Amino acid sequence: MQYNLTRIDPDAPNEQYPVGERETVTDQLLEDQVHKNIFMGKLEDVLRGAVNWGRKNSLWPYNFGLSCCYVEMTTAFTAPHDIARFGAEVIRASPRQADFMVIAGTCFVKMAPIIQRLYEQMLEPKWVISMGSCANSGGMYDIYSVVQGVDKFLPVDVYVPGCPPRPEAFLQGLMLLQESIGQERRPLSWVVGDQGIYRAEMPAQKDLRREQRIAVTNLRSPDEV
């Protein structure tokens, strides 16, 4: 093997590294290595995305039910539906250990202060899913003893329609809640309080899928599956 030795001439021009000709030198290989090994940006943005990812994929529900919709909610925990796919299979019996509560069923006036007290015992961040027509708007019980919608006394994040909704509808509501949590901007500590919290605007699904419903031309009869 033969080698050729070349003497370095410091006065020779160098197009890649011109000394004294340009203030900055462009080296694509060097830039690639810098971007691979050095983070350029705000640490707050990275932490926010990581925290939101952990929150939305580890939602612990509070275990309580009000009426028949609770039966459909518990069906989502069985093997055919497998709510564990979304990280929400850890049912908690204490509101202090739960991340979200599902108002499943008819909310009577005498139960409203109890539900509100349970909600206040939950730690931030916390969310609420209203499941079923009775929880959403009172349903067919337009009487003095039924609250006409749990949003009269609780901040509801997701509404699941139906009487009662199927387990698939509850799972879709859970996915919508995960999507909303992924876009939230809130302080990393619950001690800070409610200031500075940004929640993404979630439009109604009937508005988002309006064109899709209009495009349907083949409507099956009610007795077909």
From Swiss-Prot:
Record-listed [4Fe-4S] cluster binding positions: 68-69, 134, 163
Reaction it catalyzes: a quinone + NADH + 5 H(+)(in) = a quinol + NAD(+) + 4 H(+)(out)
Q: State the Pfam families in the record.
A: Oxidored_q6
- State its location(s): Cell inner membrane
Q: What is an example of a GO molecular function annotated in this UniProt entry? A: quinone binding
Any one GO biological process? electron transport coupled proton transport
As for membrane topology, the entry says: Peripheral membrane protein
**Which top-level group of life is the source organism from?**
Bacteria
Primary subcellular site in the record, as a coarse category: membrane
Q: Which UniProt keywords apply?
A: 4Fe-4S, Cell inner membrane, Cell membrane, Iron, Iron-sulfur, Membrane, Metal-binding, NAD, Quinone, Translocase, Transport, Ubiquinone
Cofactor binding description: Binds 1 [4Fe-4S] cluster.
Function recorded in the entry: NDH-1 shuttles electrons from NADH, via FMN and iron-sulfur (Fe-S) centers, to quinones in the respiratory chain. The immediate electron acceptor for the enzyme in this species is believed to be ubiquinone. Couples the redox reaction to proton translocation (for every two electrons transferred, four hydrogen ions are translocated across the cytoplasmic membrane), and thus conserves the redox energy in a proton gradient.
Q: How does it assemble?
A: NDH-1 is composed of 13 different subunits. Subunits NuoB, CD, E, F, and G constitute the peripheral sector of the complex.
Family of the protein in this entry: Belongs to the complex I 20 kDa subunit family.
Q: What is this protein called?
A: NADH-quinone oxidoreductase subunit B
Supply the source organism for this entry: Pseudomonas putida (strain ATCC 47054 / DSM 6125 / CFBP 8728 / NCIMB 11950 / KT2440)
Q: Which gene encodes it?
A: nuoB
